[in-house]
Amino acid sequence: MERAYDDWKMGTWSRDPFLDMMIPTLTDPTMAPPGKHFMSCFVQYCPPKVGGKNWTKENKDAFGETVIQQIADYSPGFKDKILHMEVRTPKELEEEVGLTEGNIFQGELTFDQLLFNRPIPGYAQYRSPIKGLYMCGSSTHPGGGVMGAPGRNAAVEILKDLNLPESDIRDAYEVL
């Protein structure tokens, strides 16, 4: 992981990328034709620019091949099973879903952007400056990924403001 991070700091993708792989068709086979699967890879430390320049088609293809080779090193025959591949760059993620530089964590996971500094100092308890408007998501503590913790934490603060017990957040939906 550290080598991947070091490569990212130098503005390139890692030759030994750190991957999060998901195969949703293992739990929902209706997402692909019978006997086929869909796999998604999230590559940590993918630079928003390569060597200070925008991604090119050649960069995307080479990056995709690096990721495929990383998987194939641990899963012989993997390459032969691929019918289609699509690479999304950080810039494309920014344009498509508003993630600055493709960062799913909505800010670096560094001390100056964590805990009481997330999303910004003074607004770390899920309340915005507007009464009744709460914040949750990747930009709030504890950060991004798909875990739901920021939403749960914001729900607890809403319950506190409504003077409702926080013992069972599921009941709050019916009250609101």
Regions found by a protein language model. Name each.
Residues M1-P47, E92, L99-F116, D161-P165:
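FAD cofactor-binding and catalytic pocket of flavoenzymes
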Residues A72-F78, K160-P165:
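Secondary-structure transition/capping motifs at alpha-helix termini
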Residues S138-L159:
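A conserved FAD-binding loop/helix module that cradles the flavin
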Residues L83, R88, E92, L159-L176:
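Active-site-proximal substrate-binding core of FAD-dependent oxidoreductases
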Residues S14-M22, G77-H141:
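A glycine-rich dinucleotide-binding beta-alpha-beta segment and adjacent secondary-structure elements
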Residues C41, V67, I71, L133, ...:
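Hydrophobic, well-ordered secondary-structure elements that form the walls
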Residues P29-A32, V50-G51, G143-G145:
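Short helix/loop capping segments that flank catalytic or ligand/cofactor-binding pockets
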Residues P33-Q70:
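Conserved FAD/dinucleotide-binding core of flavoprotein oxidoreductases
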